[in-house]
Amino acid sequence: LLQAQFGNAGRGWIAPFKLSKTNEPDDYFISSSVREWVTGRCIQANKKCPVGIGGIGIQSVSPSINLDVRIAPNNGAGYSFNQAILYRGEKAMPMLPAGSFKDSIQTSLATVPAVAGVLADTFRISHPVDTLQLHSTRRKQGTDKLLPASNFKNVYYGFSLTNGYPGVLYHSVGVNGAMYVNYTDEAYVRQLALLKPSLLII
């Protein structure tokens, strides 16, 4: 409703809920050929892996990981994007574009954490798209050297999708069973600030 009145700046935050074996909104899909994930949730007393902005994190020991983002053709209408920011753990394998239009994507891989333990990689696409295919790389940045898989701790948190237009960018975060107290952790609040919210609605 707000985006209809004030403009639509993009889908905003999306997280791999389905890969973490919980409910996912019906306007996007995040899929992977990797089947086994360890999942951390903000509601866990002893978290199985670190959690990110969306209150979850997914972790895999696979030496090769892909993440495919797709906006749902009906429920996601109007949420095409030309920029995606991937939030990952500091020791996670970086991702590079894959698929038919990978050459039209400008990739900026972070070298310095945006906040403690979190890297934010930016993918700028030359035209609006409804899909983004990413595949991990073990190549050391700026070299041809392949690093051993044991060097990495592959934790991924989610994406922020934008379209470059002015308007409302609405981020919805939440985990089944979560309460206010689950979102007051100091580390979580620092991560939430990465989205630069102008208004928080609890």
Regions found by a protein language model. Give the residues of each.
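Conserved SGNH/GDSL esterase-like catalytic core that processes O-acyl groups on lipids
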Residues: 2-107, 111-202
